[in-house]
Amino acid sequence: MKTPETLAFECETGNYHTFCPISCVAWLYQKIEDSFFLVVGTKTCGYFLQNALGVMIFAEPRYAMAELEEGDISAQLNDQKELEKICLQIRDDRNPSVIIWIGTCTTEIIKMDLEGIAPKLEKQIGIPIIVARANGLDYAFTQGEDTVLAAMAHRCPEYKHCTTNLKNRTDEMARIDNHTTNKSPFEASKLTRFNLVLFGSLSSSIASQLNLELKRQSISVSGWLPSQKYEELPGLGEGIYVCGVNPFLSRTATTLMRRRKCKLVGAPFPIGPDGTRAWIEKICSVFDIKSYGLENRESEIWENVKDYIQVINGKSVFFMGDNLLEISLARFLIRCGMIVYEVGIPYMDRRYQAAELLFLQHTCRKMKTPLPRIVEKPDNYGQIQRMHELKPHLAITGMAHANPLEARNIDTKWSVEFTFAQIHGFSSVRDILELVTRPLRRRGVITPGFRSLSKQTTGD
């Protein structure tokens, strides 16, 4: 098989494996600390959440299942009354600041009017209700977060209200009876002339590090979507610049631009030292600020991880496609000296990822490496045949194919691990390389000197 010399896109419209997007509850309920997620679905959805999240219901996590029964599907029960009972119980037991309903495949099939029921119920219970249809009709499981953030963007306060009256909350909160707050989501001291809002769910430590990196360039971040507290959602509107940190948030980006009239900063994503530097430089250029110190910072980090890079330099990797992080990870691994044969990706918004695709081409030219083949909606059967021919050193794949590929003597890494690991910013580079090199270390395909430096040498 010939490796293409130019950026080639293909769409196989085949069968591929990924998780259900309702899995976004796993990380979003921890990020939004005063929220409660209610998944409206069947027993299958409940079994998936129970197994995927690994939290026993006795631990009383801030999410729950509203299990559909035969009476719901046959329209013998009143959907509004049934959901009202559950939401009242949630209010009395947990008293969250917001309840987020997650629609599923079944609610789509039976045409359950969640958007029509939510406004009526939130007036009754005095708590805002956000409806997000994060169902299995999406292309990849990470798009669940995209759906939730796009729905949450509509509830962010209007930017002009934040500047004129700091005591006003969001418009939707004003419509809810008997539900007030003493804290403004947007304080005057936090407003800057740049008005930059970042969107994407990251751990608090990584978000703080990205804030600090921008602060070093004299740029203060106005807020994050999502915020840790629902009442702290950033103000949106004309004059606000928004920038994403994850490549699977195209729906949120579209909502912010078209519905909230924000200006999108099209930048590569801050994954790897090269991506983080390019991300910061792009934001600086939008605000006419000359960045400084980034080149030296990036060089120092590459020097600090050269032991890891020696392990994967010259090795080949094949992305089967699972979580929409594939383009950014491929670009980073090419910069580390790896050869990427193919990048399978369930779905790609070429407009939202335009800067990342250009950066991928730039990286390939810099490393004098042929551009990888990009396959949307890949056919897993065809990919396995191509891997049999190419014999890559490593396959980054979904869990469904890991063991079969290992049996074919191909080292694998679960792509879902990159979703939950800290991979953003300058400080997370070692964590990414730790994940990538672990399968090679497990087989002993490393030098003895490196083994003593690694944090983990056996098992996944």
From Swiss-Prot:
The question of whether ATP-binding is a record keyword is answered with yes
Name the predominant localization: plastid
What GO cellular component is one of the record's annotations? Answer: chloroplast
- What is the catalytic activity of this protein? chlorophyllide a + oxidized 2[4Fe-4S]-[ferredoxin] + 2 ADP + 2 phosphate = protochlorophyllide a + reduced 2[4Fe-4S]-[ferredoxin] + 2 ATP + 2 H2O
User: One biological process GO term for this chain?
Assistant: photosynthesis, dark reaction
The Swiss-Prot or TrEMBL record annotates one GO molecular function as: 4 iron, 4 sulfur cluster binding
UniProt keyword list: 4Fe-4S, ATP-binding, Chlorophyll biosynthesis, Chloroplast, Iron, Iron-sulfur, Metal-binding, Nucleotide-binding, Oxidoreductase, Photosynthesis, Plastid
Q: How is the cofactor bound?
A: Binds 1 [4Fe-4S] cluster per heterodimer. The cluster is bound at the heterodimer interface by residues from both subunits.
Q: How does it assemble?
A: Protochlorophyllide reductase is composed of three subunits; ChlL, ChlN and ChlB. Forms a heterotetramer of two ChlB and two ChlN subunits.
- Function as written in the Swiss-Prot or TrEMBL entry: Component of the dark-operative protochlorophyllide reductase (DPOR) that uses Mg-ATP and reduced ferredoxin to reduce ring D of protochlorophyllide (Pchlide) to form chlorophyllide a (Chlide). This reaction is light-independent. The NB-protein (ChlN-ChlB) is the catalytic component of the complex.
The name this protein carries in UniProt is Light-independent protochlorophyllide reductase subunit N
The scientific name of the source species is: Adiantum capillus-veneris
Gene from which the chain derives: chlN
